[in-house]
Amino acid sequence: MYVTNNTALAGGAYRKRKKKFQRPKPRKRARKSKKPPKSENTYVQRFWKNPPRNYILKEPTKPISSYARWIPPEIVDVNNITVNIPNTITASRLPKTEFQETEVFKDARDQWYFPIRPSDGEHDTDVKVKKKWSLDTVLQFLQSSPKHIRQLLLTSLFGSLLGLILDTLFGGPWNLTSRLLRLIISVVPGGRILLTALDGLGYFLGNSANPIHLIENPMMQAFGNSIQKQISPRLAEDIIKAADEQIGGGFMRTIASILSAAASAGTHFTMALPAIPIAAVRPFMR
Protein backbone atom coordinates (compact mmCIF):
# COMPACT_ATOMS: atom_id res chain seq x y z
CA MET A 1 0.00 0.00 0.00
CA TYR A 2 1.35 3.38 -1.01
CA VAL A 3 0.76 6.26 1.46
CA THR A 4 1.88 9.73 0.64
CA ASN A 5 1.01 11.88 3.64
CA ASN A 6 0.35 9.22 6.29
CA THR A 7 2.67 6.89 8.20
CA ALA A 8 1.76 3.23 8.89
CA LEU A 9 1.82 2.14 12.49
CA ALA A 10 1.56 -1.24 14.22
CA GLY A 11 -1.93 -2.70 14.36
CA GLY A 12 -2.96 -1.22 11.07
CA ALA A 13 -3.40 2.34 12.40
CA TYR A 14 -2.40 5.37 10.46
CA ARG A 15 -1.12 8.73 11.73
CA LYS A 16 -1.16 11.93 9.79
CA ARG A 17 2.13 13.62 9.34
CA LYS A 18 2.08 17.30 10.29
CA LYS A 19 3.38 19.71 7.73
CA LYS A 20 5.38 22.71 8.73
CA PHE A 21 3.41 25.95 8.33
CA GLN A 22 4.96 28.25 5.77
CA ARG A 23 4.02 31.92 5.79
CA PRO A 24 3.39 33.49 2.42
CA LYS A 25 6.10 35.89 1.40
CA PRO A 26 4.84 39.42 0.90
CA ARG A 27 5.31 41.00 -2.48
CA LYS A 28 7.83 43.76 -2.59
CA ARG A 29 5.84 45.80 -5.07
CA ALA A 30 2.10 45.58 -5.24
CA ARG A 31 0.39 45.87 -8.55
CA LYS A 32 -0.79 49.37 -9.40
CA SER A 33 -3.89 48.10 -11.09
CA LYS A 34 -5.25 46.68 -7.82
CA LYS A 35 -4.60 49.83 -5.77
CA PRO A 36 -7.62 52.15 -5.39
CA PRO A 37 -7.04 55.85 -6.10
CA LYS A 38 -5.95 57.91 -3.12
CA SER A 39 -8.90 60.10 -2.26
CA GLU A 40 -10.46 61.24 0.97
CA ASN A 41 -13.93 61.15 -0.48
CA THR A 42 -15.53 57.74 -0.08
CA TYR A 43 -17.96 58.46 -2.88
CA VAL A 44 -15.10 58.54 -5.37
CA GLN A 45 -13.87 55.16 -4.14
CA ARG A 46 -17.34 53.66 -4.42
CA PHE A 47 -17.70 55.18 -7.85
CA TRP A 48 -14.41 53.61 -8.89
CA LYS A 49 -15.39 50.22 -7.51
CA ASN A 50 -18.95 50.28 -8.86
CA PRO A 51 -19.01 52.47 -11.96
CA PRO A 52 -22.48 53.39 -13.27
CA ARG A 53 -23.68 51.64 -16.38
CA ASN A 54 -26.39 54.04 -17.54
CA TYR A 55 -24.47 57.30 -17.82
CA ILE A 56 -24.72 57.26 -21.61
CA LEU A 57 -27.88 59.08 -22.69
CA LYS A 58 -29.90 57.65 -25.48
CA GLU A 59 -30.50 59.75 -28.55
CA PRO A 60 -34.08 60.97 -29.14
CA THR A 61 -36.00 58.86 -31.56
CA LYS A 62 -38.13 61.77 -32.86
CA PRO A 63 -36.52 64.49 -35.01
CA ILE A 64 -36.31 68.05 -33.66
CA SER A 65 -38.45 69.40 -36.50
CA SER A 66 -41.43 67.45 -35.21
CA TYR A 67 -41.73 69.34 -31.91
CA ALA A 68 -39.70 72.57 -32.42
CA ARG A 69 -40.89 75.49 -34.55
CA TRP A 70 -39.79 79.12 -35.03
CA ILE A 71 -41.94 81.85 -33.51
CA PRO A 72 -41.40 85.41 -34.82
CA PRO A 73 -40.73 88.13 -32.17
CA GLU A 74 -43.46 90.57 -31.17
CA ILE A 75 -43.08 94.21 -32.18
CA VAL A 76 -43.56 96.41 -29.10
CA ASP A 77 -44.10 100.17 -29.29
CA VAL A 78 -41.61 101.70 -26.89
CA ASN A 79 -43.46 105.02 -26.66
CA ASN A 80 -46.72 103.41 -25.50
CA ILE A 81 -45.65 101.27 -22.58
CA THR A 82 -48.07 101.07 -19.67
CA VAL A 83 -47.24 99.64 -16.30
CA ASN A 84 -50.12 98.22 -14.30
CA ILE A 85 -49.51 98.81 -10.60
CA PRO A 86 -51.97 97.04 -8.31
CA ASN A 87 -53.76 99.24 -5.80
CA THR A 88 -52.83 97.10 -2.84
CA ILE A 89 -51.69 98.54 0.46
CA THR A 90 -48.91 96.55 2.04
CA ALA A 91 -49.26 96.44 5.81
CA SER A 92 -46.87 95.00 8.33
CA ARG A 93 -47.80 91.75 9.96
CA LEU A 94 -47.06 92.89 13.48
CA PRO A 95 -49.06 95.78 14.98
CA LYS A 96 -47.20 99.02 15.63
CA THR A 97 -46.19 99.32 19.26
CA GLU A 98 -45.88 102.76 20.81
CA PHE A 99 -43.64 103.30 23.81
CA GLN A 100 -44.31 106.06 26.28
CA GLU A 101 -41.37 108.47 26.30
CA THR A 102 -39.95 109.58 29.60
CA GLU A 103 -40.40 113.22 30.48
CA VAL A 104 -37.16 115.18 30.21
CA PHE A 105 -36.97 118.54 31.93
CA LYS A 106 -35.24 121.50 30.31
CA ASP A 107 -32.78 121.92 33.16
CA ALA A 108 -31.94 118.20 33.27
CA ARG A 109 -28.61 116.90 31.98
CA ASP A 110 -28.72 113.98 29.60
CA GLN A 111 -25.73 111.79 30.45
CA TRP A 112 -26.07 109.74 27.27
CA TYR A 113 -25.68 112.61 24.82
CA PHE A 114 -23.50 115.08 26.73
CA PRO A 115 -20.11 114.02 28.12
CA ILE A 116 -19.50 114.40 31.82
CA ARG A 117 -17.06 117.20 32.50
CA PRO A 118 -14.62 116.56 35.35
CA SER A 119 -14.46 118.85 38.33
CA ASP A 120 -12.88 122.28 37.97
CA GLY A 121 -9.12 122.17 37.76
CA GLU A 122 -8.81 118.59 36.53
CA HIS A 123 -7.68 117.88 32.97
CA ASP A 124 -8.22 121.49 31.87
CA THR A 125 -6.22 122.41 28.79
CA ASP A 126 -6.05 125.72 26.96
CA VAL A 127 -6.72 124.78 23.35
CA LYS A 128 -7.88 128.13 22.05
CA VAL A 129 -5.22 130.15 23.88
CA LYS A 130 -1.82 128.96 22.74
CA LYS A 131 0.09 132.24 23.17
CA LYS A 132 -0.42 132.99 26.83
CA TRP A 133 1.99 135.59 28.17
CA SER A 134 3.85 134.93 31.40
CA LEU A 135 3.76 137.33 34.35
CA ASP A 136 7.21 138.71 33.53
CA THR A 137 6.14 139.41 29.93
CA VAL A 138 2.99 141.20 31.13
CA LEU A 139 5.02 143.36 33.55
CA GLN A 140 7.55 144.25 30.84
CA PHE A 141 4.72 145.20 28.49
CA LEU A 142 3.04 147.41 31.09
CA GLN A 143 6.34 149.12 31.98
CA SER A 144 7.35 149.75 28.36
CA SER A 145 3.92 150.69 26.95
CA PRO A 146 2.77 154.33 26.79
CA LYS A 147 1.03 155.80 29.82
CA HIS A 148 -2.41 156.19 28.26
CA ILE A 149 -2.49 152.54 27.13
CA ARG A 150 -1.32 151.35 30.55
CA GLN A 151 -3.94 153.48 32.32
CA LEU A 152 -6.74 152.25 30.05
CA LEU A 153 -5.87 148.59 30.64
CA LEU A 154 -5.39 148.86 34.41
CA THR A 155 -8.43 151.07 35.11
CA SER A 156 -10.71 148.87 32.99
CA LEU A 157 -9.42 145.82 34.84
CA PHE A 158 -9.09 147.06 38.45
CA GLY A 159 -11.22 150.19 38.55
CA SER A 160 -10.23 153.85 38.72
CA LEU A 161 -8.56 153.97 42.16
CA LEU A 162 -6.63 150.71 42.17
CA GLY A 163 -5.81 151.11 38.48
CA LEU A 164 -4.29 154.53 39.16
CA ILE A 165 -2.17 153.13 42.01
CA LEU A 166 -0.93 150.21 39.89
CA ASP A 167 -0.23 152.58 36.99
CA THR A 168 2.05 154.58 39.29
CA LEU A 169 3.65 151.36 40.55
CA PHE A 170 4.31 149.93 37.07
CA GLY A 171 5.23 153.21 35.39
CA GLY A 172 7.63 154.45 38.07
CA PRO A 173 11.43 154.21 38.07
CA TRP A 174 11.47 151.30 40.56
CA ASN A 175 12.29 148.55 38.04
CA LEU A 176 9.48 146.33 39.29
CA THR A 177 9.93 142.60 38.64
CA SER A 178 7.57 139.67 39.11
CA ARG A 179 9.52 138.53 42.17
CA LEU A 180 9.20 141.95 43.81
CA LEU A 181 5.51 142.12 42.90
CA ARG A 182 4.90 138.72 44.49
CA LEU A 183 6.72 139.95 47.61
CA ILE A 184 4.47 143.00 47.85
CA ILE A 185 1.31 140.96 47.24
CA SER A 186 2.28 138.34 49.83
CA VAL A 187 2.15 141.00 52.56
CA VAL A 188 -1.28 142.30 51.48
CA PRO A 189 -4.31 140.27 52.65
CA GLY A 190 -6.39 139.25 49.64
CA GLY A 191 -3.69 140.30 47.20
CA ARG A 192 -3.85 137.05 45.23
CA ILE A 193 -6.61 138.63 43.17
CA LEU A 194 -3.97 140.86 41.53
CA LEU A 195 -1.99 137.85 40.30
CA THR A 196 -5.20 136.27 38.98
CA ALA A 197 -6.10 139.46 37.12
CA LEU A 198 -2.63 139.87 35.61
CA ASP A 199 -2.59 136.21 34.63
CA GLY A 200 -5.92 136.67 32.85
CA LEU A 201 -4.56 139.80 31.18
CA GLY A 202 -1.78 137.63 29.76
CA TYR A 203 -4.40 135.48 28.01
CA PHE A 204 -6.02 138.50 26.34
CA LEU A 205 -2.71 140.12 25.36
CA GLY A 206 -1.48 136.87 23.80
CA ASN A 207 -4.48 136.68 21.46
CA SER A 208 -4.83 140.34 20.45
CA ALA A 209 -2.72 142.14 17.89
CA ASN A 210 -3.57 145.61 19.22
CA PRO A 211 -3.86 146.02 23.03
CA ILE A 212 -6.11 149.10 22.66
CA HIS A 213 -8.85 146.88 21.21
CA LEU A 214 -8.95 144.88 24.44
CA ILE A 215 -11.06 147.58 26.07
CA GLU A 216 -13.86 146.94 23.56
CA ASN A 217 -13.67 143.16 24.03
CA PRO A 218 -16.83 141.98 25.86
CA MET A 219 -14.93 139.09 27.46
CA MET A 220 -12.37 141.55 28.82
CA GLN A 221 -15.14 143.74 30.21
CA ALA A 222 -16.83 140.77 31.90
CA PHE A 223 -13.48 139.68 33.34
CA GLY A 224 -12.83 143.17 34.71
CA ASN A 225 -16.29 143.35 36.30
CA SER A 226 -15.76 140.00 38.05
CA ILE A 227 -12.35 141.14 39.34
CA GLN A 228 -13.69 144.45 40.68
CA LYS A 229 -16.44 142.64 42.60
CA GLN A 230 -13.83 140.58 44.47
CA ILE A 231 -11.60 143.53 45.46
CA SER A 232 -11.81 144.43 49.14
CA PRO A 233 -12.22 148.12 50.16
CA ARG A 234 -8.88 148.18 52.03
CA LEU A 235 -6.86 146.57 49.21
CA ALA A 236 -5.65 149.89 47.73
CA GLU A 237 -4.49 151.21 51.11
CA ASP A 238 -2.70 147.95 51.95
CA ILE A 239 -0.91 147.91 48.58
CA ILE A 240 0.31 151.48 49.09
CA LYS A 241 1.72 150.65 52.54
CA ALA A 242 3.34 147.40 51.38
CA ALA A 243 4.88 149.04 48.30
CA ASP A 244 6.23 151.92 50.39
CA GLU A 245 7.84 149.45 52.80
CA GLN A 246 9.36 147.25 50.09
CA ILE A 247 10.27 149.83 47.44
CA GLY A 248 10.74 153.07 49.38
CA GLY A 249 11.95 156.08 47.46
CA GLY A 250 8.92 158.21 48.36
CA PHE A 251 6.30 155.96 46.80
CA MET A 252 3.63 157.08 49.28
CA ARG A 253 4.38 160.78 48.58
CA THR A 254 4.01 160.15 44.88
CA ILE A 255 0.66 158.44 45.37
CA ALA A 256 -0.51 161.24 47.69
CA SER A 257 0.33 163.94 45.18
CA ILE A 258 -1.43 162.05 42.40
CA LEU A 259 -4.55 161.48 44.49
CA SER A 260 -4.66 165.09 45.66
CA ALA A 261 -4.36 166.30 42.09
CA ALA A 262 -7.08 163.92 40.99
CA ALA A 263 -9.37 164.97 43.84
CA SER A 264 -8.87 168.67 43.07
CA ALA A 265 -9.66 168.01 39.39
CA GLY A 266 -13.04 166.53 40.36
CA THR A 267 -12.34 162.90 39.45
CA HIS A 268 -14.96 160.52 40.85
CA PHE A 269 -13.57 157.29 42.28
CA THR A 270 -15.62 154.16 42.63
CA MET A 271 -13.86 153.38 45.93
CA ALA A 272 -12.95 155.46 48.96
CA LEU A 273 -9.56 157.19 49.02
CA PRO A 274 -6.93 155.36 51.07
CA ALA A 275 -5.97 156.77 54.44
CA ILE A 276 -2.63 158.53 53.81
CA PRO A 277 -0.83 160.58 56.48
CA ILE A 278 -1.17 164.35 56.09
CA ALA A 279 2.61 164.79 56.18
CA ALA A 280 2.92 162.70 53.02
CA VAL A 281 0.45 164.84 51.05
CA ARG A 282 2.86 167.16 49.35
CA PRO A 283 4.16 167.48 45.82
CA PHE A 284 6.80 164.93 44.98
CA MET A 285 9.91 166.52 43.50
CA ARG A 286 12.48 164.45 41.70
From Swiss-Prot:
GO terms for cellular component: virion component. Keywords: Virion. Residues 1-41 are annotated as: Disordered. Its main location: virion. This is Structural protein p32K. It is found in: Virion. Residues 14-36 have a biased composition (Basic residues). Residues 1-12 form a propeptide. Belongs to the atadenoviridae p32K protein family. It comes from Ovine adenovirus D serotype 7 (isolate OAV287) (OAdV-7).
